[in-house]
UniProtKB/Swiss-Prot annotation:
InterPro entries, alphabetized: Aminoacid_DH-like_N_sf, NAD(P)-bd_dom_sf, THF_DH/CycHdrlase, THF_DH/CycHdrlase_cat_dom, THF_DH/CycHdrlase_CS, THF_DH/CycHdrlase_NAD-bd_dom
Stated name of the protein: Bifunctional protein FolD
Function: Catalyzes the oxidation of 5,10-methylenetetrahydrofolate to 5,10-methenyltetrahydrofolate and then the hydrolysis of 5,10-methenyltetrahydrofolate to 10-formyltetrahydrofolate.
Gene3D superfamilies (alphabetical): Leucine Dehydrogenase, chain A, domain 1, NAD(P)-binding Rossmann-like Domain
Key words, A-Z: Amino-acid biosynthesis, Histidine biosynthesis, Hydrolase, Methionine biosynthesis, Multifunctional enzyme, NADP, One-carbon metabolism, Oxidoreductase, Purine biosynthesis
GO cellular component: cytosol
Single Gene Ontology BP annotation: L-histidine biosynthetic process
Family classification: Belongs to the tetrahydrofolate dehydrogenase/cyclohydrolase family.
GO molecular function: methenyltetrahydrofolate cyclohydrolase activity; methylenetetrahydrofolate dehydrogenase (NADP+) activity
Organism field: Rickettsia bellii (strain OSU 85-389)
Gene: folD
Length: 283
């Protein structure tokens, strides 16, 4: 049995469905969804991520607008740019590529995006909806991608023991809310958690999102675990690895996502799904 989950194939299924939906919407309204991407500075990794998002958006018929702003821009000037996008009726969704320079107040920037265009799901209102169990806002894309992968391979999550290693607002916290909604018993661990392997080795589902290359070795998992690796770490120059020691773990668990080719493609697919949803709500 091939237990390595092909995130790219799953993402392509979603993108194919979205492409047909975008065409139907265009036939009906004469317009296409439009995603505005705000990129501050010239962080090489951010540039790669943004190009990838634009490529996949355009491939399925979503228009894109890239605002590439200087690293010297002030918080208030960036907020003014976002306000213009909020008012632009042709823009369906807005994302600000993270990380931002230290000189910019990230919380103010994310709060400046209109919640109805916040397709990354980072606005405090959308965060509040998610953690209140209200289906009325956008949910962070990586956490949606993780849940989709998990449910494809374990449709009934009720009563399952899920451990999330990582407490970020992008993955750990939103995914905990999604898994709780599926009636999982959820534990969040992090870099300061003690005896981590003794906790994760009891879990049915382990999500690694701690940003520590190859940290979780085979002793961290029980044999029938589903392992979702969200980590993206660069080692030895150009090699990309996850937070899980993939080569030594893959034969010892039920399912595992690779890095790259696992959760990354799913994140982009759900970003574009959120963008289409924003367009449908507005139109």
């Amino acid at each position: 049995m091939n237990n390595v989950i092909d995130g790219k194939a799953l993402a392509n299924e979603i993108l194919s469905e979205l492409k047909h939906e975008v065409q139907r919407l265009k036939d009906k309204t004469g317009e296409s969804p439009k995603l505005a991407i705000v990129l501050v500075g010239d962080n090489p990794a951010s540039i790669i991520y943004v190009k990838n998002k634009i490529k996949h958006a355009n491939k399925i018929g979503i228009d894109t607008l890239l605002l590439n702003l200087p690293i010297t821009i002030k918080t208030e000037d960036l907020i003014a740019k976002i306000s213009e996008l909020n008012l632009d009726q042709n823009v369906s969704g807005i994302i600000v590529q993270l990380p931002l320079p230290d000189s910019i107040d990230k919380n103010k920037i994310l709060s400046a995006i209109s919640p109805s265009k916040d397709v990354d799901g980072f606005h405090p209102l959308n965060v509040g909806y998610l953690h209140s169990g209200i289906d009325n806002g956008f949910v962070p894309c990586t956490s949606l991608g993780c849940l989709e992968v998990i449910k494809k391979h374990e449709p009934n999550l009720s009563g399952k023991n899920a451990i999330i290693v990582g407490r970020s607002n992008i993955v750990g916290k939103p995914l905990s809310a999604l898994l709780l909604k599926e009636n999982c018993s959820v534990t969040i661990c992090h870099s300061k958690s003690q005896n981590l392997s003794s906790i994760t080795s009891k879990a049915d589902i382990v999500v690694a999102a701690i940003g520590s290359p190859l940290k979780l070795t085979s002793g961290y998992f029980k044999p029938d675990a589903i392992v979702i690796d969200v980590g993206i770490n660069r080692i030895g120059g150009n090699k990309i690895v996850g937070d899980v020691d993939f080569e030594n773990v893959k034969s010892k668990v039920k399912y595992i996502t690779p890095v790259p080719g696992g959760i990354g493609p799913m994140t982009i697919a759900f970003l574009l799904k959120n963008t289409v949803q924003a367009f449908k709500i507005y139109s």
